[in-house]
């Protein structure tokens, strides 16, 4: 533990931190109202996670590419203990996952996806059982890590959305290497509320490979991508949608708006990363609630080694 407390960490969440700090300082009244609205939908655990996330977002300095921060200046003792346990867990299991899922060639493995299953482990048992045999949506499929974990819940099919060409090639390899061609449908699309195009920057360093952002000081590559809505893609679908998983790098609100009909018709479980900007963080839960008032929510940190990453909203009826 002593060694861990003295360690420094580098974090690449510059654009995320800045948007939260700007929102807080530019419009405190709206910030407080949105926070109050969000808390009214949550249990005590989620409220605690929300408050801790925002506390860190608002106090951390904006990083540059080589910015380092002392771990003990960021985390409390409980969090430091969790970080140490997470590091031990990763060291013990990472080779197992590489071998089990034929992941040779992956530069960076998101072990947290394999550990937490995008938050699905926290669902009530009856809700998890009810996922079996339904169609799953994997928005922001990356190289296929979340797709691999979703297969453990016995979907009839997984429909993957991934707009980045490099990521899509790796996703196709993961599907082939794991014998999933008949279980997975892939769309080279980003998700939004309408069919449109966008110019995206994809961070290309090894620590952030594949992350898409509007702006970043980190090395990135630009790519024109096509966006569409879940409702448009599924308009001829006749089978029940059981899950909508989204990690769409800041497009979460528009992706949920573009899934309104799907959510109202099928009431799927929703797992959505919400840490990319204030709009995602504060607005997605109330938006889902407006589609169906029976939705329940958890907000969970699904990355122990840096608490600002992978903050996920889990919603179910």
Predicted regions: what they are:
Residues 1-317:
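Phosphate/nucleotide-binding beta-alpha loop and adjacent structural elements of enzyme active sites
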């Amino acid at each position: 533990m002593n060694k861990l407390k003295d360690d420094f960490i580098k974090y690449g969440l510059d654009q995320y931190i800045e948007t939260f700090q700007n929102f807080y300082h530019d419009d405190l009244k709206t910030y407080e109202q949105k926070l109050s609205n969000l808390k009214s939908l949550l249990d005590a655990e989620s409220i605690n996670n929300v408050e801790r996330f925002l506390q860190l977002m608002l106090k951390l300095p904006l990083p540059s590419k080589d910015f380092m921060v002392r771990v003990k200046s960021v985390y409390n003792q409980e969090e430091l203990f969790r970080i140490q346990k997470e590091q031990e867990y990763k060291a013990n299991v990472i080779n197992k996952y590489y071998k089990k899922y034929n992941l040779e060639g992956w530069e960076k493995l998101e072990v947290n996806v394999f550990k937490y299953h995008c938050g699905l482990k926290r669902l009530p048992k009856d809700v998890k059982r009810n996922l079996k045999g339904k169609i799953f949506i994997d928005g922001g499929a990356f190289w296929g890590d979340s797709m691999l974990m979703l297969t453990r819940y016995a979907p009839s099919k997984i429909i993957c959305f991934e707009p980045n060409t490099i990521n899509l090639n790796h996703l196709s390899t993961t599907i082939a290497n794991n014998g999933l061609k008949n279980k997975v449908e892939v769309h080279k699309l980003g998700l939004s509320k309408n069919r449109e195009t966008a110019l995206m920057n994809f961070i290309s360093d090894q620590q952030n490979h594949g992350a898409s952002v509007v702006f970043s000081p980190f090395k990135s590559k630009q790519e024109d991508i096509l966006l569409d809505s879940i409702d448009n893609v599924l308009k001829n679908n006749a089978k029940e949608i059981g899950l909508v998983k989204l990690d769409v790098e800041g497009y979460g609100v528009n992706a949920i708006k573009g899934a309104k009909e799907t959510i109202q018709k099928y009431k799927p479980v929703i797992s959505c990363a919400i840490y990319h900007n204030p709009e995602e963080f504060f607005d997605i839960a109330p938006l889902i609630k407006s589609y169906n008032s029976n939705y329940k929510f958890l907000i969970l940190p699904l990355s122990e080694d840096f608490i600002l990453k992978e903050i996920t909203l889990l919603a179910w009826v």
